[in-house]
């Protein structure tokens, strides 16, 4: 649900929407927005995080108002990535594609892996998070602290993505991409 004190302007993003004058809330359909709103309405623990007004920054480019969304306190993860992971996993569970006990897999450089691990544990799944060798040990430790098995992959993030996808395919695990 929208904050009654906040007004947003959405520009039609497609030629047909602009031509028809159809109100549009952004990049997604009304059904997609409704689905997301219903998801959050049923989960009070995922309540909206604070919006902080930044008037000095707003004045510089001549904006009326500039608000920053503060996700630093969301489950102690200090990242917004939890919302996307939680929504994606919830949708897969609702569709029957993921069940408690399943193994969820992702490649990450940090926050997405931690969000998948946190959510997997919350819904009774296991998580395997594939990290490139360049990911700092404290990030890997933070992911492991959420209950994930951390798999180090030689090379880059793209190499970790390939290995995660290959192992998920081989073992019948579910990939949660960011």
Locations of the language-model features?
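PLP-dependent amino-acid enzyme catalytic core
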Residues: 1-178
